[in-house]
Each structure stands twice: as structure tokens, then as C-alpha cells.
Amino acid sequence: GGGVGDATVRFHRKTARGKVLKVLRETYRRDDVPCGVVAWETGADADADDRAPVLDASGIVNSTASAHYIVIDTNVVLHQMDVLESPVFTNVIVPQTVANEVRNRSMPLYNRLRTLLGDTDRRFWLFYNEFCASTAITHDADESINDRNDRAIRATATWYQAQLRARAPTQHVRTIVLVSDDVACVHRARTDGLHACSMREYIRGFANATQLEELLSARTLEERPSGDAHGFDEYWETEQLEAGVRAGTVHRG
């Protein structure tokens, strides 16, 4: 296994009666969290996880960008699942942050996401970004949980992009596309140098774009007030911690 670091996670949690409690948890961050890329998952990387890597060398065929993988955000799962379930979507990276948020918002959608993640032919990969030393971020005091989560998703996309550029062999995928229906998130990602677009923009790159557009939700590329990325309740941390306990990357104390 790889090295382990620790960090203290601070957050506030509401009780059933509405009382706000300050909670501190120590998390353990690892440098061997598998990224799911078939070409790289050997030796030490593979030892950290019992899942077989699924992200292949050819990536997705879509004219939006050269061969690529996509990273999706929470809005895409919540509002565009019908599109996401289309067979043209393969080689999709799902940050742990996204899975946690979806689980807290909609168990039916979370179960549909888990089905995609469990279908190796679809090549969806759950990446534990909250426990990877290279992608885990702290929660800034002046940002909302939702803004923090958006930043975590962008950090995941940025890390994958850097890894592909540095490590990908010839004729291998070298590009990441962040697909988000949040205007602010797309803008910030582009400012950071990432290729980012809305789901509507993205599906125009498929040969069957017309059919996919029929599945598209009207809730695409939404504007939002600053500090309120999704209007989600701020309960995601508990799920994050429980997921970490199950994964063995967070230890109860």
C-alpha cells in the first residue's frame, strides 16, 4: 500500500430538533487510491482496491474533444440520468463527492448510478477523491458546503488531466472533459484550464445527438446564486465518513 496522511475534518451537523453541533473527525488520506485507468492499475495501485480497472485506452467517441474520459458533477446525475444511461456514455469518472451528494438527495437515482458503476461494460469508475492525497481538499471557512463540493469535483478533473498528460502512452486517452449543468462550475473549470461543457453541449458531439436530446432534462445549465451550488442539505459529510469506514480509508476514533 501507499503512504497515509491525516487531516481533521470540521463540519456542523443539525440534530433532529434543529440544534447545530460542531463535529470533528480525523480522516486518513492515501496516495494509492486507484484511478481506474487500465493502463496504469498494476502493482501497488491495484493492491489498494479489489475492483478491476475499467477506463480503457480509447475513451469516448465524441466530437466535443479528442479521445477523452469525462468527469460528471452532481447536477448531471440528478437531472440527466436518462441521458447518462444511454450506451454511448462509457469511460465515465464519478467522484466520490458526487456519489455522496446523490445518495443524500435521491436514493432511486443513487441506485441507478450504482447500477452503472457495477456494469463493467459501461466503464463507469467511482474515484475516492475525498481520500486521495492528491485530490482531497479542505473546506475553506468562507465557502458553503456546495461550493466546496464543486471545487472538489474540479480538483478531481484537474488531477486526472495532469496524470493523463504526464503518464499516458502514445495513442492513449490524454484529455478530460468535465460535464456540468452548473454555469458557475463550467466557468471556473474553464478558467482553471479544463475542457468543460454542459450536458446539452456535450451530447451534440455524438452521432445520435438528436435521439439523446429527446432524453435531455429541461434543467440544463442552470444559473444559481453564489454559495448555493445545488440547494442541497449540508449532510453529505456523514455519508462521506461512513463510505470511508466501509472502504477502509477512514477509521472510527
Feature annotation, model-predicted:
Residues 1-253:
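Noncatalytic, typically N-terminal accessory segments of nucleic acid-processing enzymes
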